[in-house]
């Protein structure tokens, strides 16, 4: 019996996408996986990641090219998986798949987004019907209820095949339940977000958040020194995956820097420090106090401060402005883990779930 083909339609791929986005799980369950990168069509991607794994990867540069490939693939009857928090990017292509007798699913596995998702969800629920209701996905695999904000109508939002699961951060949490930090001592964890050189600055066409590096580095240095002096604990830096070591040393000096172990190190941290990293999901899961900081340059950049405020409002958190003087007591800015229950709804639909996201997905794909 020939393996059934899965076409994973993504903006781009990263070093660990094969694990995070289920490609390995699909292959282990007998599926043939092919990846189509469409970031040039959705977010204007200009810098592509180099594939780090053996799956076929095709970069698609136009809607015409995408439609042509869907037509050619119709003979093989693949399952299409669209990896987006909003399902509306490729409505016509999804309708074409259904008209050709094919099947597709939407996959939304990411954390809470940067826009007012609640407002979007209200708009969806106020729209009784949409033409795409005639071409619904076989399944919508959603990380949380709020991800229905990317659907088209109240009819689709109440669709019986909306499968509520959890975010990929919850997958990491499940994998790291029995892990232990190698730090060997108490520490405070700082979530680096690579504000100086993140490729999204180019890919998304947003203005650079940090325009004066010297001022930014001085403000971060003062914050970390204050934390270490007040608490008598070292600050460990959880590096962003896109950060280069040279820049990290320039910002954080001789402090310990860890890569790819943010979940593990959050579990064993005293508390964490962040501007608005998606990694706060780990802090919420492990009920760690969070210190949110901002600065003049962040507050005056694109939508990022809005993104931070959304998270802080849900967590009832104060934000420490490190561009002002740092004479206040940091303890007054730490979040209270008792306020995390509401935020948990953005991380998982079932706190008792022990299965990984794509283990659940495969069970449904096997029925198609």
Feature names for model-found ranges:
Residues 44-55, 117-124, 197-215, 300-306:
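Short, flexible/disordered intra-domain loops and linkers
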Residues 14-22, 216-220, 353, 357:
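Conserved alpha-helical elements of sugar-nucleotide-dependent glycosyltransferases
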Residues 58-68, 167-169, 174, 236-286, ...:
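Donor nucleotide-activated moiety binding/catalytic core segment of transferases
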Residues 249-253, 278-351:
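Catalytic binding pocket for nucleotide-activated donors in carbohydrate/polymer assembly enzymes
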Residues 172-246:
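Conserved catalytic-core segment of nucleotide-activated headgroup transferases in glycan assembly
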Residues 100-103, 233, 287-288:
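A short helix->loop->beta-strand "cap" motif at the edges of active sites that frequently abuts
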Residues 6-30, 35-174, 279-280:
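Active-site and donor-binding regions of nucleotide-sugar-utilizing enzymes
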Residues 78-80, 187, 270-271:
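Structural motif
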């Amino acid at each position: 019996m020939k393996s059934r083909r899965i076409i994973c339609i993504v903006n781009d791929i990263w070093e660990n996408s094969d694990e995070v986005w289920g490609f390995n799980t699909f292959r282990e369950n007998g599926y043939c996986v092919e990846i189509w990168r469409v970031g040039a069509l959705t977010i204007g991607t200009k810098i592509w990641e180099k594939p780090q794994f053996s799956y076929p990867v095709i970069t698609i540069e136009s809607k015409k090219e995408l439609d042509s490939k869907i037509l050619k693939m119709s003979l093989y009857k693949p399952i299409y998986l669209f990896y987006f928090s909003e399902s509306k990017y490729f409505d016509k292509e999804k309708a074409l798949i259904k008209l050709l007798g094919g099947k597709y699913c939407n996959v939304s596995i990411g954390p809470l987004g940067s826009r007012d998702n609640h407002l979007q969800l209200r708009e969806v629920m106020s729209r009784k019907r949409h033409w795409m209701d005639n071409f619904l996905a076989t399944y919508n695999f959603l990380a949380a209820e709020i991800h229905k904000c990317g659907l088209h109508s109240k009819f689709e939002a109440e669709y019986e095949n909306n499968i509520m699961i959890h975010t990929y951060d919850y997958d990491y949490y499940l994998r790291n339940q029995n892990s232990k930090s190698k730090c060997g001592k108490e520490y405070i964890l700082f979530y680096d977000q690579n504000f100086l050189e993140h490729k999204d600055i180019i890919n998304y066409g947003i203005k650079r958040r940090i325009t004066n590096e010297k001022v930014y580095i001085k403000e971060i240095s003062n914050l970390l020194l204050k934390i270490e002096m007040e608490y008598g604990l070292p600050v460990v830096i959880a590096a962003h995956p896109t950060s280069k070591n040279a820049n990290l040393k320039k910002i954080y000096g001789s402090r310990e820097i860890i890569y790819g172990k943010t979940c593990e190190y959050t579990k064993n941290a005293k508390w964490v420090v962040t501007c608005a990293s998606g990694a706060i999901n780990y802090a919420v899961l492990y009920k760690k106090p969070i210190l949110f900081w901002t600065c003049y340059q962040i507050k005056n950049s694109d939508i990022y401060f809005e993104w931070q405020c959304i998270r802080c409002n849900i967590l009832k958190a104060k934000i420490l402005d490190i561009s002002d003087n740092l004479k206040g007591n940091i303890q007054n800015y730490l979040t209270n883990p008792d306020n995390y229950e509401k935020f948990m709804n953005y991380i998982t639909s079932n706190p008792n779930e022990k299965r990984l996201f794509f283990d659940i997905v495969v069970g449904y794909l096997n029925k198609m």
